[in-house]
Amino acid sequence: EAAVQSILGTSERGLILRTSWVIGPVGKNFALTMLRLHRERDQLGVVADQVGCPTSTLTLAQACWRTLQIAGESQLPAVMHWSDAGAASWYDVAVAVGRIGAELGLIDTPAEVQPITTADYPTPAERPAYSLLDSTSTRAALQLSGQHWQLALRDVLQQARTP
């Protein structure tokens, strides 16, 4: 909250667009890592007790563009949330990457994905167990309906440029 106040306090016109679990067809992100691991391994252990919502760079770009289009015409909230629709665990996303990747011919056979706990996969940064963002008011303000994360994931994988 202090960071929000610091950002908004430095300008007469400021806007923060919060997002989470960003995936896209290029760069390093969870979806492309899972696609690579589905190709390389027979089995994967993926955290199943952290829930959020993947957000495609493709739909995030639409939200950013729409924000810029209407920012001068409309009174937008200073802090908005954007994510694709639905909820998923990292495990759910990994399974979906395998299924969709196989459907699209990006992998031959998906790896078997085993659910594990956060305790089974320690990381330097502590991750929240539940990190969903409510994008309802942002969707209304931007007049965008958004997309379910599985449909957005399909779009990401269709455009993926992985070796």
Indicate where each model-derived feature is located.
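A general structural signal for well-ordered alpha-helical segments in protein cores
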Residues: E1, F30-A31, T57, A61, ...
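NAD(P)-dependent short-chain dehydrogenase/reductase
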Residues: Q5-G52, T57-T59, W65-R66
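Glycine-rich Rossmann NAD(P)(H)-binding loop
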Residues: V46-V51, A78-A87, A141
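Residue-level signal for the nucleotide or nucleotide-sugar donor/cofactor binding architecture
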Residues: G52-T55, A88, L133, L144-Q147
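Amphipathic alpha-helical segments that line or abut small-molecule/effector binding pockets
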Residues: L58-Q69, Q150, R154
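Mid/C-terminal beta-alpha module of Rossmann-like enzyme folds, strongest
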Residues: A63, I70-P124
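A hydrophobic C-terminal alpha-helical subdomain
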Residues: A119-L144, L153
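Amphipathic terminal alpha-helices
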Residues: H148-P163
